[in-house]
Amino acid sequence: MSSTMFVKRNPIRETTAGKISSPSSPTLNVAVAHIRAGSYYEIDASILPQRSPENLKSIRVVMVSKITASDVSLRYPSMFSLRSHFDYSRMNRNKPMKKRSGGGLLPVFDESHVMASELAGDLLYRRIAPHELSMNRNSWGFWVSSSSRRNKFPRREVVSQPAYNTRLCRAASPEGKCSSELKSGGMIKWGRRLRVQYQSRHIDTRKNKEGEESSRVKDEVYKEEEMEKEEDDDDGNEIGGTKQEAKEITNGNRKRKLIESSTERLAQKAKVYDQKKETQIVVYKRKSERKFIDRWSVERYKLAERNMLKVMKEKNAVFGNSILRPELRSEARKLIGDTGLLDHLLKHMAGKVAPGGQDRFMRKHNADGAMEYWLESSDLIHIRKEAGVKDPYWTPPPGWKLGDNPSQDPVCAGEIRDIREELASLKRELKKLASKKEEEELVIMTTPNSCVTSQNDNLMTPAKEIYADLLKKKYKIEDQLVIIGETLRKMEEDMGWLKKTVDENYPKKPDSTETPLLLEDSPPIQTLEGEVKVVNKGNQITESPQNREKGRKHDQQERSPLSLISNTGFRICRPVGMFAWPQLPALAAATDTNASSPSHRQAYPSPFPVKPLAAKRPLGLTFPFTIIPEEAPKNLFNV
């Protein structure tokens, strides 16, 4: 039925195709009979040969421009033409069709390709109607091929008849089927990669051994069969031809026996081979899995850490002598060639234990904002936790022990600790001595006089020595404590006296005029109250006998406890230069020098007048002078 239909439809296709070009052979006309020039067709890019243009492989719709007897010319838009077409349509989407300037309804078919008519018969498998073209002309998927887009159209169902016709033409073609298959690109050509299955060496060697053993077994069986056949032939020749029936029977029995024996031998050899195979132990060398830290191997990472530790130890980078990052990087660059690994270590090694487990890498920003690195003990983090220090960079000062206050000065803490230990040892020794003394008293009470005298001679000598040493130590410590207490008490008294003196003698009347004292042979000084006072040659101020009774009463009322305490053999003298606590040697030397030199007899006004407290009665006059000789002491208090 199909052949009759083919014969009836052929004249119509020949007439339509004859208007364009005159066919040279009926078989080629049948191959391109369903193709019309000027029409648009959808192509099957999967059957394109390898030498076809790349743009044609990505295009879905082409136009037939010319049909000849041997080939078909196609025109199709390039990707640049499609992009320009869609860009222009997107820009002028809101304009009416009449007002649009430039551009067209369809993209420009600026590419062309010529192919064989046999290939075109299969490639152009569906004709696109004009109304479908007008509806889908602004769709990108309509022009560009895609697997999802091609699956929507049933290709082979629509073109079953033309494809059948092309197959008939290929069958009737004088070139044969092979040439058409070669032209259609069915053969693998240069540039194609073939899949190769790789097997490891131990599998290949095992297969080779198995093949060699099986071939050896087969060769042995074959040789045995040949030997048996030769023996059978020799036996047959010797017997002769008189007994042919008996010979045939014997030959049949022999063949049966040979077959049975050969099968038994093969089975035995197979069993032995299987047993050997079961007992065989195959050892494979498996490569150990390489472990990585980030993107570097463990060996390489550990080597870089060791080199970094070596550089920091050479530079003595410890707490207080840290090394800056640029200097450390330049030195470590000589040993660590991978700069990426070097920068990674500089960034992430802070807080990690160095190789060896004794040191720890540390880093922080200094006051200038630069990064600095140093090494510290790996146990220091546990010491901080036990001491209760929250500062991650705290380092114990020298002399610090676990249990001391972290905020206290270690020198003071050490001295206080030593004093406490000495006092504790003294207390223990005193307790021992007291206990020994009690024991000795008990022994004296319990033993007779003769025994006591003999025992005392033996026991008292070392005890007396120990007791004497302890008493010496005790006296020394007590003397030191007494000296310290007296010094502190004198300092407190001097400070109170100085404060009281400044408060009492600070000038409240700046307009008052005071006359300076004279050094030697001065006339009597008349005070505001009419009291007369005389300056002796020894730089001492004395009062007239008329005012002594008044002074005594006034002294009893106004004399301070400090003046009572200071009522000693020392006398309050006129200060030389600066007011100081009197010292007899220094004061005598200063007095002699002042008395001998006439230049010192002139008095100078003092900006801070001080009125000293006398032993008997406080004077009402101030001494405004500031003579500071070089020999005078500089300290305010000389205890």
Curated annotation (Swiss-Prot):
Annotated stretches, region: Disordered: 201-256, 536-561
Gene Ontology process terms (BP): female meiosis sister chromatid cohesion; male meiosis sister chromatid cohesion; reciprocal meiotic recombination
Subcellular location: Nucleus
Record field: compositional bias (Basic and acidic residues): 201-226, 546-558
Domain PI-PLC X-box: 351-498
Gene ablation phenotype (knockout): Plants contain 2 cells with prominent nuclei in the central region of the ovule where the embryo sac is normally located. Sometimes, an unreduced diploid female gamete, arising from apomeiosis, can be fertilized by a haploid male gamete, leading to a viable triploid embryo.
Bias type Acidic residues, positions: 227-237
Tissue: Meiocytes (at protein level).
GO CC, any one term: nucleus
InterPro entries: DYAD/AMEIOTIC1 (IPR044221)
Keywords annotated in UniProt: Developmental protein, Meiosis, Nucleus
Disulfide bridges in this chain: none
Function statement: Required for fertility. Involved in chromatid cohesion establishment, in chromosome structure during male and female meiosis (e.g. the synapse formation between homologous chromosomes, the recombination, and the cohesion of both chromatid arm and centromere), and in axial element formation. Regulates the switch from mitosis to the reductional meiosis division of megaspores prior to the female gametogenesis (megasporogenesis).
Record protein name field: Protein DYAD
Highest classification ranks of the organism: Eukaryota, Viridiplantae, Streptophyta, Embryophyta, Tracheophyta
Gene this protein is translated from: DYAD
